[in-house]
Amino acid sequence: MEKLEKRYGLPTAICMVVGTVIGSGVFFKAQNVLAATGGDMPLGILAWIITGVLMILCSLQFASMAQKYQKVSGVVDYAEVTCGKGYAYYLAWFLVNIYYPGMTSVLAWVSARYFGVLFGWDLAGPEVLCLAGFTLVASYTLNAFSPKLAGKFQISATVIKLIPIVLMAIVGTVAGLKSGVLTSNFTTVVSEAVGGKSGGLFAAVVATVFAYEGWIVATSINAELKNPKTNLPIALIIGSIIVVVAYVFYYIGVAGGATNAVLIEEGATTAFTNIFGTIGGTFLNICIVISCLGTLNGLMVGATRGMYAISSRGEGPRPEMFNQVDKSTNMVTNSSIWGLFVCSAWLLYFYGANLTSGWFGYFNFDSSELPIVTIYGLYIPIFIIWMIKEKELGFVKRFLLPVLALAACGFMVFAAIYAHGITPYLNAKANGEFSCPVLFYLIIFAVIMLVGAFVKKPKKK
């Protein structure tokens, strides 16, 4: 089997974590958090911090595992050394055919959507859909033809996307304190949160889960990272902390640009326009486009390397084909082609399920969030077996970190089930109807995993 070149350093790995997480979520989820808490600023900040802490807890556990294990694809390797080759295969199959392409396809559409805002396009129209397809192919092309250039773009996109966040955090806070808007937003609420403060907090945390998702994608470059045992743990921890700090201060800065009532109705663009003028509003949309493209690039890195991770273990369909590395670009070309195909299929599904009247009936679900139901659930056996097997480790690494990570995973899974299962079911039941997106997502998940079981081992000659 051909080996991948060690080409990425610590800055790229940190940018992969920051760039993959800080995407569309930080800009439009702030509005959702305000709505969930009824405009209660301190409660909203607490929600951002809670979810951020959960992400850091999982990062710490994976950082601990990265210090001991490394092979090809990060989290898949951790699954193999803890739960065995069989479990690692199914985790990799899930990542390749559901998680990476589902998230990547949505980010392609979101990138096109915010670009379309600049020209007044219909957000569900053919222009945005065509542009989404183009951005998907463009990201694939960048990663397939020049992985090093893709890494440099990741660094550039991370720096650019932090500019509006930093500006809003500083200028928005100062302007808000000067005008009194920020003080007013902190001391008053627009309305009582549904279910009281506890219900509002839980709903807000659910809203922030998507904004924090994606950090684990950085582990997909484990085999291409220089000194991975040291650099990957550092990248996961530093990157996660940067994300939490950026989200909290951006959220505060936005509140300095408009009242909570206005922000709930119109979103963060109004705050940028109030502080920086019309040009500032346009600048925000441009930065959002760059932010989403950076996130798309980070997810495409994982999507294009997925089948390589499976075939490198001699499993899956045609392993001898998918583990080939192009000699001129040092890229896993055949694996990349499969990644693009599956991403395109999920883009078609996302459009039909979420941007039209619904092509799939009960099987319409949000492919941007529901993979969380399984990705965190699939981490749980890894952490449990780690505690059982790693007897030579001290108390902190063997028990404390994995237990905290298990609690974080359990919360994430329950939050996703609550938001996409319990709530829509109760709302539909009140109207004499039935709706449970998470149930039908899990059916699709089961079918895809059964296909994976069918092609698990190559046929013997």
Residue ranges and their predicted role:
Residues 75-80, 84, 117-121, 235-298, ...:
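TM-loop-TM module centered on a large, flexible mid-protein loop between adjacent transmembrane helices
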Residues 1-42, 55-60, 71-72, 456-461:
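Membrane-interface "cap" regions at the ends of multi-pass membrane proteins
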Residues 176-177, 365-384, 388, 395-461:
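A generic transmembrane alpha-helix motif of multi-pass inner-membrane proteins
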Residues 127-181, 213, 236-240, 374-380, ...:
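Membrane-interface loop-to-helix entry segments
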Residues 35-40, 68-72, 81-87, 223-231, ...:
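Juxtamembrane helix-boundary/capping and inter-helix hinge elements in multi-pass membrane proteins
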Residues 34-39, 114-128, 148-157, 266, ...:
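Transmembrane helix-loop boundary segments of multi-pass membrane transporters
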Residues 3-6, 45, 122-127, 155-285, ...:
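Helix-loop-helix junctions that connect adjacent transmembrane segments
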